[in-house]
Amino acid sequence: STECGGYINRWMGTPNPAFERAASFFQGHFEGLGYETHILRVTDHGNPTEPESLNVIAWKEGRDDSCVQGMGAHMDIAPPGGPPGGGTYEGAYDNTGGTVSMMLFAKAFVEIEVECDTFLALWSSEEEGLRGSSAFANNDCDYCLPTDKELRFYINMDMMGISYPAIKPTGEPYPYHAWSGPDIDPEVQDVEITSVLDHVHRDILGAPMDMRIEGTYGAGCDQHWPEHEDLVMDVHEDTFGRSDHVTFRDLGAQTIFHLGAYDSDYSAYHSPDDTLDNMIEVVGGEDELKKSMEFVMWAAMLEFMIADQTPEVRNVNA
């Protein structure tokens, strides 16, 4: 937040001391927990003072060195003047929430053994076209995505907290989105991670999977939207894009994308009003925000742990 000179103004694309300062802080957090951590800086225009992308990548060794998997969130925020709301300086919802979730997951994973080598990542340049995750996945470096290992799955955290179980000022629940993929054939389930996604929400967390509102939610870009436009728990297999999971889905990984209310369901999207104070206000208090943040974080944590132990969750091209 803006308190205590917080790590705000994390815009990417020009020399930005605020972004560099934040990246160094995040790197120190992962290193302090014992992770092998790197800052991945990529330039493609000959000017090293203006990196095309700057990511923080923490690695955890797995039992099987023939495969790799990961979780991530973008740490950059919408630049000034950006659509649709004019850009932001704090980016509390998009995507400081996801950034902090990765810092907390890193704490939890310290004592957990994983099957495959695992990366926990904070991406840059998501708001400029997924350039950060693409730089990691499509370049050759010692701490980039290995090309000689099977990429099994990836879970993406974006825009967290303004979603079920939080309630809108109008009295209806905020929408909760979690999409798995790839969704190759819209008529059938294509990947096993979809079963993991459904099991976590339906059976473990006891989410109201069939709850619907009167009317419709204000935004929908997935190919199943006509079936789900009034569904609170929009949890299913789909082709939805717009964030870094696409980078890994395109490489055959099974993916899950967590997203809260967006576009017209959250008026502060990509605007100067995207602050922690505003998030607390629109969900009805700090306790309500904590509940909604904890719900999606437990979901993602459980998804990761179950997918890690599910051999059928593997690259669709394997």
Regions found by a protein language model. Name each.
Residues 2-61:
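A non-catalytic alpha/beta surface segment that caps or lines the substrate-entry region
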Residues 12-23, 51, 68, 91-99, ...:
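Solvent-exposed, acidic/flexible segments
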Residues 17-37, 97-104, 108, 117, ...:
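Extracytoplasmic/secreted proteins, especially bacterial periplasmic and envelope-associated proteins
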Residues 26, 37-41, 55-59, 68-73, ...:
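Structural recognition of the beta-strand scaffold that forms the well-ordered cores
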Residues 36, 43-49, 62-65, 75-79, ...:
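Solvent-exposed loop/turn segments at secondary-structure junctions
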Residues 58, 71, 76-77, 81-130, ...:
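Alpha-helical metal-binding/catalytic segments enriched in His/Glu/Asp
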Residues 123-257:
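Metal-dependent peptidase/peptidase-like ectodomains
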Residues 259-317:
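His/Asp/Glu-rich mid-to-C-terminal helical/loop segments that flank catalytic regions of hydrolases
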